[in-house]
Amino acid sequence: MKPFLRWCFVATALTLAGCSNTSWRKSEVLAVPLQPTLQQEVILARMEQILASRALTDDERAQLLYERGVLYDSLGLRALARNDFSQALAIRPDMPEVFNYLGIYLTQAGNFDAAYEAFDSVLELDPTYNYAHLNRGIALYYGGRDKLAQDDLLAFYQDDPNDPFRSLWLYLAEQKLDEKQAKEVLKQHFEKSDKEQWGWNIVEFYLGNISEQTLMERLKADATDNTSLAEHLSETNFYLGKYYLSLGDLDSATALFKLAVANNVHNFVEHRYALLELSLLGQDQDDLAESDQQ
């Protein structure tokens, strides 16, 4: 096929594909994908210099390795982050925050039993580390242990009922047990909340109070800069993907999970598990196919 004809064919296919979608998607809300900042690069260089020094105590070295791992993770450099976390744990095996990150990576890799053990270790070392309930609950959710997932995510919700994303994750877990009851509980949580955080708009969509178009219009109006727009899009597209997945619309779900990932908000739970959702949907994800044995 001649290049010009090939381009015409592709353009026509894209146009027809667009026509099958809802009209508002013709003006899709997009953000510039987040990129590493100069400050982050400078901090990494400085950390490298300090770690090369022999003047650090074991505790200082373990803490700095952990902090560099967190920075690597925020940049999407998971292999480097895992390496730093593993080194930190070898020096200080009593760091709950390190077990928490390793548990997240194990969940993303689908190694659920090892993830449960990692999060159990977090709570054994620090019973007040509440985010371990979120992360273990998510691991249990993807691992098919629905009632245990509900227990963890309920504990996480109760720690801050005004956080909409706690209500959303609890809803996703309870939806697998009793969809009608789960929606009623979500409605109660919405009515009791202060409704101040952006994510309650997503809850309103789940409850059928607003349309998808209204949700996206509110998202665009609420964003103060490109960073907040990218973050809101990562969150919203993930939960929209879960919504369409529950309806059996795999094409829309796949597209939305890809949009959630495209914003490069690597340290958001929605980015992490959009990648896992794509893997479960059979998408080729080299990053997820790698071995996550710790």
Swiss-Prot record:
Classification via Pfam families: TPR_16 (PF13432)
Annotated keywords: Cell cycle, Cell division, Cell membrane, Lipoprotein, Membrane, Palmitate, Repeat, Signal, TPR repeat
Gene Ontology biological process terms from the UniProt entry: cell division; peptidoglycan metabolic process
Domain of life, per lineage: Bacteria
Membrane topology field: Lipid-anchor
Covalently lipidated residues, kind S-diacylglycerol cysteine: C19
Lipid moiety-binding region (N-palmitoyl cysteine): C19
Knockout-associated phenotype: Highly sensitive to osmotic conditions in low-salt medium and also thermosensitive under low-salt conditions. Shows pronounced filamentation at 42 degrees Celsius under low osmolarity, but not at 30 or 37 degrees. Growth in low-salt medium is severely restricted at 30 degrees and no growth is observed at 37 and 42 degrees Celsius. Shows increased eDNA production. Produces 100-fold more outer-membrane vesicles making the organism more resistant to toxins, and enhancing survival under stress. Higher sensitivity to ultra high pressure than wild-type counterparts.
Record bears the keyword Chaperone: no
TPR repeat feature ranges: 62-95, 96-129, 234-267
Compartment annotation: Cell membrane
Subunit structure as annotated in this protein's UniProt entry: Homodimer. Interacts with Prc and IbpB.
Other information: Processed by Prc protease in the C-terminus.
Protein name: Lipoprotein NlpI
Gene: nlpI
